[in-house]
Amino acid sequence: RQRQMCIRDRLGRIHSIDDAKTSVERAKSAGFNNISLDLMMGIPNQTIESLEKSISFCADCKVTHISSYILKIEENTPFYKVQNKLKLADDDMQAEMYLRAVEMLDSLGYKQYEISNFAKQGYESRHNTNYWRCGEYIGIGPSAHSFFEGKRFFYSRSMDDFNNNKLSFEGTGGDEEEFIMLSLRLKSGLNYSEFEEKFGYTLPPYIIKKAKEYEKYGYTFLETAQDLSLIHISEPTR
């Protein structure tokens, strides 16, 4: 418990373990039956043992969904300024943590349906799945981002700009490469028919060829059943 609190403190979080548990209990009392928790890995001085305790805590809260992410140091953040002083997990340790998380979450009934997301059966995030399927969405309010009719745009965080209806455009999105990349993040994989329906032509042969090459090394596997053809990323293994 003390180690968990130290990890929390290193992240600059002010809530306690009890606060987190109370928040979940209050959400349930308010009538929410689909609750998700975020699980972080690769935190300074984190160990496999402390990660396992965090996973057990999430499961003990009896939530229906868990998102698990590896710490990434972004520019213009407090961690970025002191990253040379941080004892961060190397790539091998991060991989070990990820594999252990996948293994343990599965044993607790949280099935992986996307690279970083796990859920009890029937509780996969419809909101995020829409992003991974290149679906459209409209953001409302300052700083809100949207993707509509092939264009990405967002409102300024400034209330004045928002009130003046000022939009900033990020460019286009939802193209073939993005669709393929996001589909491969999903357990369900890249569906040939969905690609053809969305873009009006069949999946380029070079994509299938490349997937077959990776299949030899165990990185991908191709599945064909009746009229269904899929490309999947292989299960993570040590």
Question: Residue ranges of each PLM-predicted region?
Answer:
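Short amphipathic alpha-helical interaction segments
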Residues: Y201-E213
